[in-house]
């Protein structure tokens, strides 16, 4: 059972890292886009990145915490799993603080299903009148920072596996 949980944790962390890293790797090219093209591209990420990234991120938090509880308390493996869980929590916090408010702005005029409208309606609408380049930079940098912490979570889970 422990090995299965370790493998699932690493796969979920890899999914989380892939979504955030994908955004980070395309950043140099997207920063060269004119407003018209950038705004046309932004809505295409939904639903793939939203569903895949969300599943990976929430899954990493839950499964890495479960893994930490399954390992001997105070062991290096347990401590590393808890650190991975903390890193995954930071990835989620960064999403809600930096990325989600901008996603809400990008998708405000998009035709999406009712459940998605509900999801993107969560949180304050603090983007009214904001300059598009400020929103772009916030979104792009937010994903770059998230990629660092998502990668860290994956590395910590791999280290936990090695230490177990």
Feature locations, PLM:
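Interfacial loop at the N-terminal end of multi-pass membrane proteins
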Residues: 13-63, 107-136
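Interfacial segments of alpha-helical transmembrane regions
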Residues: 2-14, 66-92
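Portal/gating segments that form or line small-molecule/metal binding sites
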Residues: 70-85, 95, 101-102, 107-111, ...
């Amino acid at each position: 059972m422990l090995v299965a949980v370790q493998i699932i944790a690493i796969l979920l962390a890899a999914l989380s890292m892939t979504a955030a890293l994908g955004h980070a790797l395309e950043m140099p090219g997207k920063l060269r886009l004119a407003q018209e093209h950038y705004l046309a591209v932004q809505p295409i990420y939904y639903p793939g990145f939203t569903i895949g990234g969300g599943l990976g991120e929430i899954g990493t938090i839950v499964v890495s915490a479960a893994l930490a509880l399954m390992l001997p308390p105070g062991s290096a493996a347990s401590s590393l799993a808890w650190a991975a869980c903390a890193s995954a929590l930071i990835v989620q916090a960064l999403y809600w603080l930096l990325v989600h408010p901008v996603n809400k702005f990008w998708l405000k005029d998009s035709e999406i299903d009712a459940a998605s409208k509900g999801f993107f309606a969560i949180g304050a609408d603090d983007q009214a009148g904001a300059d598009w380049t400020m929103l772009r930079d916030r979104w792009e940098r937010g994903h770059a920072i998230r990629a660092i912490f998502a990668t860290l979570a994956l590395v910590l889970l791999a280290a936990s596996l090695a230490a177990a």
